[in-house]
Amino acid sequence: MSRSRQPPLVTGISPNEGIPWTKVTIRGENLGTGPTDLIGLTICGHNCLLTAEWMSASKIVCRVGQAKNDKGDIIVTTKSGGRGTSTVSFKLLKPEKIGILDQSAVWVDEMNYYDMRTDRNKGIPPLSLRPANPLGIEIEKSKFSQKDLEMLFHGMSADFTSENFSAAWYLIENHSNTSFEQLKMAVTNLKRQANKKSEGSLAYVKGGLSTFFEAQDALSAIHQKLEADGTEKVEGSMTQKLENVLNRASNTADTLFQEVLGRKDKADSTRNALNVLQRFKFLFNLPLNIERNIQKGDYDVVINDYEKAKSLFGKTEVQVFKKYYAEVETRIEALRELLLDKLLETPSTLHDQKRYIRYLSDLHASGDPAWQCIGAQHKWILQLMHSCKEGYVKDLKGNPGLHSPMLDLDNDTRPSVLGHLSQTASLKRGSSFQSGRDDTWRYKTPHRVAFVEKLTKLVLSQLPNFWKLWISYVNGSLFSETAEKSGQIERSKNVRQRQNDFKKMIQEVMHSLVKLTRGALLPLSIRDGEAKQYGGWEVKCELSGQWLAHAIQTVRLTHESLTALEIPNDLLQTIQDLILDLRVRCVMATLQHTAEEIKRLAEKEDWIVDNEGLTSLPCQFEQCIVCSLQSLKGVLECKPGEASVFQQPKTQEEVCQLSINIMQVFIYCLEQLSTKPDADIDTTHLSVDVSSPDLFGSIHEDFSLTSEQRLLIVLSNCCYLERHTFLNIAEHFEKHNFQGIEKITQVSMASLKELDQRLFENYIELKADPIVGSLEPGIYAGYFDWKDCLPPTGVRNYLKEALVNIIAVHAEVFTISKELVPRVLSKVIEAVSEELSRLMQCVSSFSKNGALQARLEICALRDTVAVYLTPESKSSFKQALEALPQLSSGADKKLLEELLNKFKSSMHLQLTCFQAASSTMMKT
């Protein structure tokens, strides 16, 4: 592929030499159209693209990298021009090593300067450092190239701190022009530096030796003075003298601080008096403080003050204290009543309930406030449940066509199953299942279903706190530590007595939940005496299977949530029973609804026939049942703890009967379609499969179906149902654990075969009777007489007309279903052969020519339809031939054979249909 631009050309670089990481400016031609066009930049063989900055088509700025080559070209590569060339080069210099004591304007990477094998993990002591100029003479850099020196001293180094230090290299590099005298002076300097290192520490000690001796003399003099003073007897020993001095100092101190200590004692007494006054002030102000704190809601402060006052003045005998303490008790009693009212107030949160119970416990309230709270909550939950039902019933009577406003889906914090309804209850059964449903269908929830959703939401919002309150009551966490210690024995006795009472409360809540749900969804399952309390919905129509499935999901989620609270299973058994009854009812309703849908399938028959002679009706029937069973998948599935829907024999029998009814309803639809008058057939949408052969012949023009054609289509559908559809449906029933599948299949197959045989006989009667009826008039047309007739010259027209009519039947059946051709033609030929045998047996006698003519026509018919002969038709042909006189001469046999060949040759085109189908008929 030719490039649109010339290759890049580098004509200049500034600077043209430098150490690694030197910033350079590259100039040239065709250096790229932009930053993205630049794809390569190498200097001395090193890739510098990462540091490259494209400025223009003639300028690039970058930094030189750590190249291996000392000198090399600058190569630029672009997308538009490819790999370029260079007319200039860049020289890469080796960086000079900076000594460890040398000043540097940049940060030195010591990893590249020193051998870390010897210096790893240890510092360099100051005395081991070498000066930058160890010889002490002027350094003069040599003019020898670094490369030449490296080649000369291979593997050595000019660094005097290196292990591979080479003195010759160092002298050539730094002192190549130094004279011999100067080098001798340098040796002297080097020796002097070595001596300084060994003499340094010794000189330090020698310089401070006189100081050490002076300190030693001073310490010895002090020691001798103390020993001399201790032996003198002036006013006793030195220790007695010291004791007298200390005693005088103590007396003097007491005299000086006597006044201060007196003031301290007075201050202490005053402080004690103020403390006593403060103690009384607390009691005097306590009634007012209690009222103020109660108004502010600071009950903790009130309780603490009360406990404090009780400990201080609870047993006082002072009258004034008794008076004020009595007022405190009055205020506290009022507080107890206030807290009890707040505790029994509904609705309230679990946190508030625990708080009020703890307050009352700390205040030593009489009775059992916690149990009173539990009882109040129980009544409140029952009241809410019944009020919810009354509200929905009232709303239903007032606005029967509207969705209940009480179901607030948006504010429901519990996981709602309405969101899953489209997955669990949607039945994709064609347009009939989706008709009239728009995006707002979920807001048209039936009132009874919405009530169950609201009822379960209500129970799950109240019962957990109710259960947790009881658990806290049992384990004593509702009460404070002091109250627990004081009333532990009495409370444990109350808990044992009230366990049965609380169990009855839970049972009553579960009973109400189940009864209210049954009243809404299963009104026939509650007794007449309970209908007013739990029912009253005035049900006009049963709920559909999809809404029952949704309600089942709702109740299941409720059961799971209650189980998570660790409520005993025996208390939740009524909910399990409800779920089972709902599942059974849902299955029944869905199957009944499916039967209704299948009954309407006849209206959808479009009579469009495919290559196999089938319409869409069998497929629609199977799809309808499959969708119904799919919608029941979640209902039939057993959740943990649930029983099978089919565990009861009665349920098995009812489901089996409904399944049989579904199959028989469809069979009835087929029968109705086969006998439907022509005027009732809607042919406006009639069509045929464009890939099929010329179906129906001339009917394409007027788009009309005859009753015979409808019979054939229904017969073809019946065959497909027997061989495929019914067996597939049985597999689907078995997949969903239906019981009595063999019975369903046997009864359905028997009904289908009965319909098939009846329709088949009707069709044969319609087609065979005209052909059979035309034989006798055709045989005796023109006053034909078997006793007196001319020698045969060929097959007469009546037989040809009969064959043409049989061919017409073949064509009509073949256009609908190839598989029906052998069955239909075999029966038609049986009827024709039977009639022909009867006619031959009725003839009293035959002449020679008559016998030959009859044998010719019988053999011609038999040979033509040989592939469709059955044992019955073969027997009829045999009887017909036996009724004829036997051929006596070979000339007659030869004439018969010639006439048969002449007949087959003349009607070869008409008889081709029988020959073409021979292989298929043999297989069939």
From Swiss-Prot:
Pfam families, per database record: Sec5, TIG
Tissue: Widely expressed with highest levels in brain and placenta.
Coiled coil: 240-260
Sites bearing Phosphothreonine, chain numbering: T440
Consequence recorded when altering L580S: In NEDFACH; uncertain significance; no effect on protein abundance
Annotated localization: Midbody, Midbody ring
Molecular function terms from GO: protein kinase binding; small GTPase binding
Keywords from the UniProt entry: Acetylation, Coiled coil, Disease variant, Exocytosis, Intellectual disability, Neurodegeneration, Phosphoprotein, Protein transport, Transport
Residues recorded as bearing Phosphoserine in the entry: S431, S432, S435, S888
An individual GO BP term: mitotic cytokinesis
Domain IPT/TIG: 8-93
GO cellular component term of the entry, any: cytosol
InterPro entries attached to this UniProt entry: EXOC2/Sec5 (IPR029175), EXOC2/Sec5_N_dom (IPR039481), Ig-like_fold (IPR013783), Ig_E-set (IPR014756), IPT_dom (IPR002909)
Outcome following mutation: T11A: Impaired cytokinesis. Loss of RALA-binding. No change in localization to the midbody during cytokinesis
N6-acetyllysine PTM positions: K454
Entry's free-text remark on domains: Interacts with RALA through the TIG domain.
Family according to the record: Belongs to the SEC5 family.
Disease affiliated with this protein: Neurodevelopmental disorder with dysmorphic facies and cerebellar hypoplasia: An autosomal recessive disorder characterized by global developmental delay, intellectual disability, facial dysmorphism, and abnormalities of the cerebellum observed on brain imaging. Disease severity is variable. Some affected individuals have poor overall growth with microcephaly, delayed walking, spasticity, and poor or absent speech. Others may achieve more significant developmental milestones.
Subunit structure: The exocyst complex is composed of EXOC1, EXOC2, EXOC3, EXOC4, EXOC5, EXOC6, EXOC7 and EXOC8. Interacts with EXOC3L1. Interacts with GNEFR/DELGEF; this interaction occurs only in the presence of magnesium or manganese and is stimulated by dCTP or GTP. Interacts with RALA and RALB. Interacts with ARL13B; regulates ARL13B localization to the cilium membrane.
Primary role: Component of the exocyst complex involved in the docking of exocytic vesicles with fusion sites on the plasma membrane.
Protein name: Exocyst complex component 2
Organism in which the protein naturally occurs: Homo sapiens
Lineage: Eukaryota, Metazoa, Chordata, Craniata, Vertebrata
